């Protein structure tokens, strides 16, 4: 049985990346929350 996580840089950035987050209002809310919390990394 293969492992479920098969990392791909393109898929990671397209699904969870900064530009993807910025493209929707909810994504911008996510970034705002993470900035407020003081996260070092905002997105993938």
Swiss-Prot record:
Swiss-Prot/TrEMBL GO biological process terms: translation
GO molecular function: structural constituent of ribosome
Disulfide bonds: none
Any GO CC annotation of this UniProt entry: ribonucleoprotein complex
Keyword ATP-binding part of the UniProt annotation: no
Record-linked Gene3D superfamilies: 1.10.287.3980
Region of interest: Disordered: 1-44
Alphabetical UniProt keywords: Ribonucleoprotein, Ribosomal protein
Biased composition (Basic residues): 1-22, 31-44
InterPro entries, per database record: Ribosomal_bL34, Ribosomal_bL34_CS
Entry keyword annotation includes Transcription: no
Coiled coil: none
Annotated TM spans: none
Family statement drawn from the similarity comment of this UniProt entry: Belongs to the bacterial ribosomal protein bL34 family.
Record PANTHER family: LARGE RIBOSOMAL SUBUNIT PROTEIN BL34M, MITOCHONDRIAL RIBOSOMAL PROTEIN 34 FAMILY MEMBER
The protein's name in its UniProt record: Large ribosomal subunit protein bL34
Taxonomic lineage from the root: Bacteria, Bacillati, Bacillota, Bacilli, Lactobacillales
